[in-house]
Amino acid sequence: AAIPVPRLGTPAAIFDLNCAATFRLFQACADHGIDQIVVASSINAIGYHFGRLGFEIDYLPVDEEHPKTTSDPYSFSKQVTEDIATYFARTANINSLCLRFGAGLQSLSMLREGLVPKLLRAREQMDRLAQMSATAAADQIRRLRHHHDDDRQHPDKESQLTADERSLMGLRHNFFSFIELAEACRAIRLALMHKIVGSQPMFVVDSRNTLNMPAQVLAQLMYPEVVVRAEFSENQSLVDWQRARSIGFESQVAAAELID
């Protein structure tokens, strides 16, 4: 059990359930000789999506080594959860994989109802951005980022963004990542079967981005100031999924299939 988003609990409640309960679970495993655990972390362990203090990511594709800059209780709780796993790997020889699940985490029926309309409207906005000059598109993203950061820092203020713009920025700050619930469960099973030494975070995302766009174009339009460190291929994810592939996991459900 955990509180999955900041709005569902007070900062203290989020920390108590997400962190203290995790510590107790690890301690119980240590007391009873259990030496392998799979932890439900989140793509938000980096702090990009919910953070009250806005920042830009260092590079794309985002991988497990990207620095964490958490400034909200939920993201911080996931950062601490991963630190708890590292602590018990060091002190009790408990091996663990901390699965950083991407956006989605619902059944196909729920995703079709809630996510698909957002994706369709996001594609319309992307089409308009693509028709602008590179300078104008970058200026538009800077404007959206400014207001999005302001919204998170001052949640009681009236937003200067439209509902569709807020939705697009939400997708952006989850790196246009996606994972369906049953696929996430399959990743957990594979992680339990995979023997590792120590503790590692691992992104669990579909290998394709949610908008099913050429990744190079998506990165240029939506992250014009971010360094791209590896060549993108077709509609691939902006989040590196190779560590998950190393345990035999590759998502069989893409966000694009929800629309078909």
Language-model regions, residue ranges each:
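Conserved Rossmann-fold NAD(P)-dependent oxidoreductase catalytic core, especially the SDR/UDP-sugar
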Residues: 23-71
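Catalytic helix-loop patch of NAD(P)-dependent Rossmann-fold dehydrogenases
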Residues: 16, 52-96
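C-terminal substrate-binding subdomain of Rossmann-fold SDR/epimerase-dehydratase oxidoreductases
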Residues: 171, 175-260
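Hydrophobic positions on the long internal alpha-helix
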Residues: 21, 25-29, 84-85, 187, ...
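Glycine-rich NAD(P)-binding loop of the Rossmann-fold in SDR/ketoreductase-type enzymes
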Residues: 13-24, 76-77, 179
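NAD(P)H-binding glycine-rich loop region in Rossmannoid oxidoreductase-like domains
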Residues: 1-17
